[in-house]
Every structure is written in C-alpha cells, then in structure tokens.
UniProtKB/Swiss-Prot annotation:
Database matches in NCBIfam families: RNaseIII
One Gene Ontology term, aspect cellular component: cytoplasm
Domain RNase III, residue spans: 2-128
EC code: 3.1.26.3
Domain of life: Bacteria
Species per Swiss-Prot/TrEMBL record: Phytoplasma mali (strain AT)
Name the UniProt record assigns to this protein: Ribonuclease 3
Length: 225
C-alpha cells in the first residue's frame, strides 16, 4: 500500500521507515505500542518545509509582489483547507494508519493536513530540499492558482478599513467588448477618495482585482511606516 503512494510521488526513497512514520497517526502508534513512531515530529518539520517551499516559489514567481502581499498568499496557500486539497489529490486519506477508534470515523481535515505535512518532513529528511521541491511542484503547484484565485480580497479589505472605522465602495466605471468577451473596470473609493482600480471578465472579478490592488498598496504603506 505504501509503495503505491511512493509511486505517486515519483521518488526513490532511501529510508522507507520515514514514509511509514509519516502516515502513522498517534492513535495507531499508541494502540500498537510503537514508541516515538507516530507522525507528530515529522509534521512539525514538514510544516516548516512546506512554508519554505511556498515562500521560495512566491519569491521566484511573483517578482512584482511585496512582502506583505506574498505573506497573505502564502498563508492562504498553506492553511489547513489548502493542505487538504493537496493531500486528497494523491488520495493520502487512503494510506493513513489509524487506531481502531479513529477508523470508525471519517478522517478529519486536521489528521489529513498533518499527514501531508509529515510526508514532506519525511521527503526532506530522506532525500533533501531539492527532491522535496520537485514533489512540491508536482503536487502543489498545479492546484495553487485556483487556491490563490479564490482568496477573498474584498473581505480582507473590508475588514481592514472597518478596523480603521472607514467605509469603502466599489463602482463599475467601464464595460467594453462583446457579450462573450466583456472586460469590466472597477474602481475603489475609500471615504469618497479613489484609491485604485481593477479589471476582470466579470464585475465580481474586477472588484476582486481592485481590492487586491488596494491591499497591495496599503501593505506597502504599512511596511514603509
């Protein structure tokens, strides 16, 4: 069973015991009296590895973005919900070793996300950063754009301006193109002052793009303060 998972990762392990440990939940280890053989320590390491891999990717591929904005993207891309998406793409839930009590339940998102982190901890320990990066590119990157695209910039901006007791408004100021290929322009007003604009194929996406732009500008201002 573990060999099938290894094939999906397209790697050649040196220490197979690390990969077995990465999918061993504490309930299974306790039940089978496997001292220090659960995946919790690997999870700790894997969390740091995945954060570094994501930071590396964003720094390299998103040259125009500032530190504050990249931090927001990284946080969204490595949160529990995102880790679960990556884990399910390789059916990791089918390989996790659980105690009898846990087997009677559905594997929850926390267990699945933790196992995914532990798996990257194992890859890093066994094969190093370069191979961990190759697996990251194989599993994470193809799904990353959808996750980043689904960041709700309008809500983030709304929460920010509300904390400053200000109001924000959006207006669609331009609509061009044919029905099947329209492009909309949205402008953002903070306390009646035009602070940015965005573009999109729908009104909603144009407003999200405008909010993204303003957040980027505001985060630059915070960094300079």
């Amino acid at each position: 069973m573990l060999s099938t998972l290894i094939k999906k990762l397209k790697i050649k392990p040196k220490q197979i015991s690390l990969y077995k440990m990465s999918i061993t939940h504490s309930s299974y280890a306790n039940e089978n009296k496997l001292k220090k053989k659960d995946n919790e320590r690997l999870e700790f390491l894997g969390d740091a590895v995945i954060n570094l891999l994501m930071a590396d990717y964003l720094y390299t591929k998103k040259e125009k973005e500032n530190e504050g904005f990249m931090s927001k993207k990284r946080a969204q891309s490595v949160c529990e919900d995102s880790l679960v998406i990556y884990a399910k793409s390789i059916q990791l839930q089918n390989y996790i070793l659980l105690g009898k009590g846990e087997k009677n339940k559905n594997i929850n998102n926390s267990i699945l996300a933790n196992a995914f982190e532990a798996l990257f901890g194992a890859i890093y320990l066994d094969l190093g950063y370069y191979i961990a990066k190759k697996v990251f590119i194989l599993i994470v990157i193809p799904r990353l754009s959808n996750i980043i695209d689904n960041i709700d910039f309008k809500t983030q901006l709304q929460e920010l301006v509300q904390s400053q007791k200000k109001t924000i408004s959006y207006y669609i100021t331009e609509e061009k193109g044919l029905d099947h290929s329209k492009e909309f322009t949205a402008e953002v007003f903070l306390e009646k002052k035009n602070v940015g604009r965005g573009f999109g194929k729908t009104k909603k996406s144009a407003e999200q793009d405008a909010a993204r732009y303003v957040l980027n500008i505001l985060s630059k201002g915070e960094k300079n303060d």
